[in-house]
Amino acid sequence: PDYVPRSGQPGKDVVWVPTQQVLIERMFEMARLTKDDYLIDLGSGDGRTVISAAKRGVRALGIEYNPDLVTLSKRTAEAEGVTDKARFVEGDIFETNFSDATVLTLFLLPELNLKLRPTILNMKPGTRVVSNTFMMDDWEPDETAVVADNCSSYCRAYHWVVPAKVAGTWRLGDGELKLAQSFQKLSGTLTVAGKAQPISDARMKGGEISFMAGGRSYTGRVDNDRMNGSSDIGRASRRRSVESLLGTAS
């Protein structure tokens, strides 16, 4: 007889509870999922998240420890006609490389999220991570959503964007930008012409940096050890390129 999984059945690290379809769709919306993405689902269960992504034309991979669930997922993908986009591998999420994902989905317990967190934070800046129900300890989400309709349990999702690592001193044209970083949140000082200004409202979103200093709004993009950006002058809508935010890390 065909294998039929049971909600709540024990697994290697967590019991298996399927993510409800309405929440899957909301998670995709939060991640701004497109056909250019490569989605990896950690602990893919019966394959529904991966198959849902594949139906949108997205390449997707499910990593699942239970071989019966992997077989079921492959069979479902074939029945749905998405084997060209949906793949499933039997493996341990803590031992399988998922670093090439542009979107990562998970429905794991908080302690497992925390165990995965260092690996996730080392992924490419801009990688989107969406979790059903459970958070990443003190790494606060960039976005939270609750689905009220057609969802009976586990109806909350959290979305993070992996931030670029920018802590340290950046040399600017005639000064420097000193940054301390806690995940996507930043603090520090901008020194121009010998005058230090504390920065505020400072944060990363992937490789994009934004902060206020001295009444000006700065935005930039970080690419490894270089930062390119611009500044709003006061409240004017006019923007100008500022060489002072063309920085290099030191």
What spans do the regions from the language model cover?
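C-terminal substrate-binding/active-site "lid" region of AdoMet-derived donor-dependent transferases
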Residues: 113-165
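Conserved class I S-adenosyl-L-methionine
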Residues: 36-45
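Conserved SAM-binding motif I beta-strand of class I
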Residues: 59-64
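A short SAM/SAH-binding and catalytic strip from SAM-dependent methyltransferases
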Residues: 98-115
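Conserved SAM-binding loop of SAM-dependent methyltransferases across substrates and taxa
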Residues: 46-58
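S-adenosyl-L-methionine
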Residues: 1-37, 67-100
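Central antiparallel beta-sheet cores of small beta-barrel/beta-sandwich binding domains
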Residues: 164-232
